[in-house]
């Protein structure tokens, strides 16, 4: 256009050449200048993120100066799996980093470490699948995932890094076991355990989900094995009672309480007819003893085979064998009850009636006494069993104290009146429940007692890739702990690390390692060949981060007192009765022996929801629905992905991933960038509206963030960005202080772009060295408000009025406005003003 107009104005053909040359020079300079200015304002996420990642490495923003209050924010550390990270893994890490950066801006020194849960079944199964030694595959996976975690730009302190396979770490895992052994909390026992035929190892009850192995999903069976156990039951009451101390989700606390399963009741002795034996049962309902019409024993009960009469022996033996092949979970969840009559009877001690003794696999050997008295009229399982096998049903509780004839289903109401119960008839069952336990004790055929569902922890595994259990088996001295000064007991190299399936660990084949001398007597002895479970290291790792190079003690008392416990713990709810329960147990034990001064590891717990693929299906390589973050970071930037991870849905709920959603977040970041870059040099003074909007922004974001409503925080940024863009158009810009405030609020969520814009706005150093903005309630109040004016309930006008206007003035303005628009009210009977809400004029 410039050239064309220049030539049109030139009538001197001789000057055309030089004029053309001049205008081309000027125009090219002008276009280049415009393009340079435009490029300078354009947001280039790759360049910005590269620049600030380098800056943070050279100038750490989270430094302990000894003056700041500590805040310990921790992720559940990952298994170093071979598949690496997908967008679902990012979510928890982004949440913890946002919270950590927020706490930094609030003036804390934030402890935010990362490490690797690298021993155990997940790592070993992957190594076997790939045909690589677990030591090599684990190291490779750690290296790969560490690179991926770096892409998140989280402020992890890698100087605190721990790895459960590092001998300098597992020295202390073994040390804890030795201490537990010396305190009588670690012991050896042979009994039927959950056995995974695929993983070829024993499993704790917590590792069996719906009858299958938590890891490989194979059906779980039973196997008699020598096992090491940890007496977690010794801490049952404290684990239950101390849940009240914790700022944890109610769901998790209930799951732990239910798993511990404390109940009050009575133990009652039933004598076997015609013999010296008696059967001890535990019942929570001693008030229903008159209704106990049969007994059921676990197939593993010590009297199970002995009670079989000659004509029932073959049938009983067969049933016991079949039950031994089922896992506890399968037995409990079986829809159809099975059983066999032993041919023997016991005597009900309350009414001296004979009751048949049955075996059934719905009764477990390790709960209560392994035997139950059955009251089919008032228990659904017993009712179903009695109906199937034609056993007597006697109702002893009814709603009104009257018998209603034959029951169609068990009466299981909590309250009722006793019937068919001798001297107890007419009593309220809830009152009798406590008195009945006392009566049983007074009469000498039982006692009041407390029972727990929680079982001792099966701690040993018949696998290679785990911490060696530091115990020596001596024929003379028995089980002897490896001396503490000889720890760590190193995991030896093996040629074959595959599980044997025989009940022996691969370590059993290394004679030169197994054969040793007893630390007590010096005679020939053998090492324990089972290894610890994957939960051993993860039950205490959070203590080691803060003192990970200490070779003299697990953690120094000085550092423990200064930096522990964990203030915020973030991870999935799937660990509610595994890792979280075990970590509480370990912490209480370490408190009891004086290692730490607190007995709960995690003050606050946040469980993030899962990111799923389409139709809510869990992301997995086998499903082909894994979304890698790498391409998204390349195309949209780390900041955009971080914010979309939060924007996709409420952080505590599962959310379905959709790549298209990140485009909206990317547009927001570009619009925000352009707003700041356009306004930064405008030298606009803050108007009342700018100040009001600034303080309202801070208030809204602060409240949403502290409510952990992170998705609405991101929505709030978008909402206020639009408001400021509109205000900027009206006012010719936005003042620098308001822009700095917005950038600071955004910084925990999108750290790279925030650092760059902070610098563009003239901020000193890093944005993370400033303080989280504050707000003033008075400043953020509106000066004007919109009041709808109604006539007989229908809106006719809207007035913009001062927030302090009085009723009479507002009513007058409303009438005048109605006159102006031709909607006057002739016969007014009532004038209503709801302050700050509405005016309604009622007329005939």
Could you describe each region identified by the protein language model?
Residues 233, 238-261, 298-340, 487-512, ...:
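Amphipathic alpha-helical
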Residues 39-74, 104-113, 137-144, 319-358, ...:
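Conserved oxyanion/phosphate-binding beta-strand-loop segments in alpha/beta enzyme cores
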Residues 9, 13, 24-59, 63-70, ...:
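Basic, alpha-helical terminal appendages of large translation-related enzymes
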